[in-house]
């Protein structure tokens, strides 16, 4: 059990530290995606996970991060947290072309459980690009993928789930060092007596993370 415990700075609010676990999974996911300095990265979905991927890609030295997201509120949050541009899904191909000089993204990370996005992402990365299916998908989901796009363009397709102890340690250091702004992602705070109101706010267009504080 001791191996599951981590020491964090005492001055960090618990609501910020609560995001260390999903951030650890994001750290693991970007290890598969191999995000490197000067990369152009596409993040599909600007929920909490997408916003963590965005920030970590920036911290890793990505030259540009393009975010695709249908919610106007979450697109605004993505731009506040460092996205080069946050666009509606229908505009993502043009945005990637613009920021990559027509070559395609170096890496695309699917952060929302829409199976069709996996096939779309394959066509949005450059030859030799990387696509990571980070999101979980509904049971029985099927994604249509053009195998020739993978074969001839030598696209690397991976999945990612869970994290290692070292990823959790990295996540804590990133939060403690101020490299990942988890505080900005907690958009609503409720006291324990108002827990039902908090649950009702989850999923709202203007909500990213909702915290219940003692």
Predicted feature residues:
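Glycine-rich phosphate-binding loop and adjacent beta-alpha segment
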Residues: 114-177, 214
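Short amphipathic alpha-helix with an adjacent loop that forms part of the alpha/beta core around
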Residues: 92-102
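A generic alpha-to-beta junction signature in SAM-dependent methyltransferases
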Residues: 33-35, 100, 125-126
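Glycine-rich phosphate/adenylate-binding loop and adjacent beta-alpha elements
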Residues: 1-6
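C-terminal hydrophobic helical "lid"/dimerization subdomain
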Residues: 119-123, 165-214
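Mid-domain Rossmann-like dinucleotide-binding core that forms the NAD(H)/NADP(H) cofactor-binding site
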Residues: 10-91
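Short SAM/SAH-binding signature in class I
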Residues: 103-109, 129-130
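Glycine-centered, small-residue-biased loops immediately flanking beta-strands
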Residues: 39, 129-130, 208
């Amino acid at each position: 059990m001791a191996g599951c415990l981590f020491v964090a700075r005492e001055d960090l609010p618990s609501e910020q530290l609560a995001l260390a676990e999903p951030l650890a999974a994001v750290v693991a996911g970007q290890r598969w995606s191999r995000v490197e300095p000067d990369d152009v990265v596409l993040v599909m979905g600007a929920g909490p996970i997408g916003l963590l991927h965005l920030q970590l890609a920036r911290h890793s030295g990505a030259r540009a991060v393009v975010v695709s997201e249908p919610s106007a509120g979450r697109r605004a949050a993505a731009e506040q947290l460092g996205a080069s541009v946050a666009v509606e899904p229908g505009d993502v191909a043009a945005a990637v072309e613009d920021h990559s000089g027509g070559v395609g993204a170096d890496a695309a990370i699917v952060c929302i459980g829409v199976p069709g996005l996996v096939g779309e992402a394959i066509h949005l990365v450059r030859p030799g690009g990387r696509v990571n299916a980070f999101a979980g998908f509904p049971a029985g989901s099927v994604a249509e993928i053009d195998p020739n796009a993978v074969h001839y363009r030598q696209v690397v397709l991976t999945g990612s789930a869970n994290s290692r102890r070292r990823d959790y340690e990295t996540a804590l250091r990133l939060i403690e060092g101020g490299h990942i702004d988890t505080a900005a992602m907690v958009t609503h705070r409720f006291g324990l007596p108002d827990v039902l109101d908090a649950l009702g706010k989850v999923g709202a267009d203007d909500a990213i993370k909702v915290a219940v504080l003692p």
